[in-house]
Amino acid sequence: PSAFGAEVVWWENDFPAVRPLIGDKVEKVRDLVKPKVTAGELGRILDYTRVFLERTEGKIPIRLGDIQGPLDNAALIFGHTAFLEALITAPCEVHRLLDMITGLMIEFTAAQRDFVRAAGAEFVPSSFQPWLPDGRGISVANDVAVMLSPELHDEFGVPYLNRLSDALGGVYIHSCGNWTHLFPSLEKVRGLRGLEFGASEAPYEKVLARFGGRTVLACRVGLHRDIRFAGMADFVKRVLAAAPTPRGLFIHIDITNGLVDESWPETDLEELYALLDAGNPDWPALAGRSKAP
């Protein structure tokens, strides 16, 4: 958003925020032009990339900056309420902005990759876990999608995810919240490398049943206030029990993006290792069943 001219507000004790640039004045979109890859905070990311490369002498991999995704960036530039309204009342202007954002994301990713490769370091094109090999896609935050119908996501989400995928070798999509209503739309995304989600937010049983074995599923505890796990071991047990296959399953064994309280027990890593080693007793039977004619 800052590359397009939106003001970033740096709170003292919280994450930064963006003041909407467009609001209800949709005509402002017509005056926007695609920025350079050094505009706004993008330039700062590239500067930090250079510094990190110099100080590590190119020996440590460098991740893609967290540049979010087309829908998320457009919503920040508009302001979320104005953006959701504009999907219905001003679709041409929304598509114009999404087109510029997508092009800028592709160009910025290439620029950061070039800096990293020129230093002889490994470029990791994902800003969240797990590791994604260079050339196999790009991580995309698609949080705004949870507020869209499948039809709106088909129109305003999928074309730009596909453009990113075609240009960069795939997309690895993160979304907070419950996006299970978008299953049919997400299946239209080309080169879907993975889905990153909170188990308490997007019901993990449904996600695993629909996409298990088809793409990487990176599952974390989640931030739902009313749906809780009784500890990390309980979380791991329940995810393993629901997973139809271990293929592509990645379980976040941390609470960085998990809502827990004082009742959360201390995590016993040895217990987790044993659970992961044991897996799901149904997996061999399921694997055999999938091979049956």
What are these regions (language model features)?
Residues L21-D31:
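Residues forming anionic-ligand binding surfaces in small-molecule and nucleic-acid pockets
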Residues S2-V18, K34-P293:
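Active-site loop segments of alpha/beta catalytic cores
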